[in-house]
Amino acid sequence: MQRAALTSALCYRDAKAALNFLEAAFGFELTMLIEDNDGKLAHAEMGFGDSLIMIGNEWSQMHKSPASIDGFNTQTVHIHLDADIDAHCERARAAGFEILMEPEDQFYGDRTYRCRDPEGHFWTVGAPIRSVSVDEAEATSGLKVVKGWA
C-alpha cells in the first residue's frame, strides 16, 4: 500500500486488543505488526480502503489513551464508507463500541453515526446517501458555505 500524505495514529493501553476490536467493528486489516523482544507491540498499521491508521501503546506521560486521561480526546477519527451505514453501526455495536449518536441523515447529504471505542477514542462514520446543492445545504442548516463544497 502506498502511504497517504496524512495518517492518523492512535495510542491505546492495550494496543493488541485494539487491533482486534478495530478489525471486528470496522473491518480494518492488519498490514504491519512490529513487536519488541518480549512480544510487546512496538508499532502496528491497519489498512482500510486506500487509507491506513497507525496503532500503538502509550509511550510517554504526554501520549496517552483516553482511558488513561479520564476519557478526554483531542481528535475524532472519521471513516468514509460507500456501504450501508446502519449495518456498519450494528457491527460496531456488536464489537463493543458505544454508539453515541445513532445513524442519522445530515444536511450535507451523508448518513452518519458516532461511536466511542472501548478505550474512549471517538469515531464518526458516514456514507453519502444523496447529492445536496450549496443552496439546499445552506437553507437546511442555516450555515453559510464559504469555500470548498463539492
Q: What do these predicted regions represent?
A:
Residues M1-L10, L19-N20, F26-R116, G126-A150:
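Vicinal oxygen chelate
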Residues A15:
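A short, glycine-centered helix-capping/turn motif at helix boundaries
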Residues E119:
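C-terminal catalytic core of tyrosine-transesterase DNA break-rejoin enzymes
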